[in-house]
Amino acid sequence: MVLISVLASLLVLQLSYAQKSSELVIGGAECNINEHRSLVLLYNSSRLFGGGTLINKEWVLSAAHCDGENMKIYLGLHHFRLPNKDRQIRVAKEKYFCRDRKSIVDKDIMLIKLNKPVNNSTHIAPLSLPSSPPSVGSDCRIMGWGTITSPNDTYPKVPHCANINILEHSLCERAYNDLSASSRTLCAGIEKGGIDTCKGDSGGPLICNGQIQGIVSWGDEVCGKPNKPGVYTKVFDYTDWIRNIIAGNTAATCPQ
């Protein structure tokens, strides 16, 4: 495993208000080693692409803008310097998208088929797809290896977790001019600020009621600002597409 000091020195950060492709949890704390069994890390020797979520033994869900060349997929990872015996590494066999990967305002989703199945273990297990969409006010969990400070970056050696809520979508519409009411996204965070996903967390999960309800997508350039919640891909709207792709119907149509 590459040492965190080396990894941090090689990160290529692409900062814009509409991208969290290298972001971490602001206002959180170290995740319990047993609570992020589905969390994966996407990176190569020179760049942190973001996170993702294992949804079955062969498939990972992430954000489209986290895609990159020579990307490796790490599972069962907690401490960069102390990889545990359960750690497994995979690469993408196939990738599926719902839109032009250059834009992340909407349809920011990537479905990855692994080159070989993973083995479930103490620190590796899939997360369920949503059976229904989350309601406003729902308590949710965010997690990732992104920066824990903003605007200056501080990358941790372990993933951080925090609790946030599903907010009215109109709050994000007011905060971001590019976001439309019809976008297939969720608005989530803490209205007063202080807790947020940030650079390095993109592609990671928004977990509500034990299911992956959102994918970390984008937000303000400075993470954790009041009235500037995060925007998350709404996974429920893509469940039919995801299941069709997994079943072998690779021509499945994305929701419009």
From Swiss-Prot:
Gene Ontology cellular component terms for the protein in this record: extracellular region; secretory granule
Keyword entries, A-Z: Blood coagulation cascade activating toxin, Disulfide bond, Glycoprotein, Hemostasis impairing toxin, Hydrolase, Platelet aggregation activating toxin, Protease, Secreted, Serine protease, Signal, Toxin, Zymogen
Intrachain disulfide bonds: 31-161, 98-254, 140-208, 172-187, 198-223
Proregion positions: 19-24
One MF term in the entry's GO annotations: serine-type endopeptidase activity
Modes of activity regulation: Its platelets aggregating activity is inhibited by chlorpromazine, theophylline mepacrine. Its platelet aggregating activity and its amidolytic activity are inhibited by PMSF, TPCK, TLCK and soybean trypsin inhibitors. Is unaffected by hirudin or by antithrombin-III in the presence of heparin.
Tissue spec. comment: Expressed by the venom gland.
The protein's enzyme class: hydrolase
InterPro entries: Peptidase_S1_PA, Peptidase_S1_PA_chymotrypsin, Peptidase_S1A, Trypsin_dom, TRYPSIN_HIS, TRYPSIN_SER
Gene Ontology BP term (one): proteolysis
Domain of life: Eukaryota
Leader sequence segment: 1-18
Entry EC number(s): 3.4.21.-
Residue span, Peptidase S1 domain: 25-247
Assigned protein family: Belongs to the peptidase S1 family. Snake venom subfamily.
Protein's name in the database: Thrombin-like enzyme cerastocytin
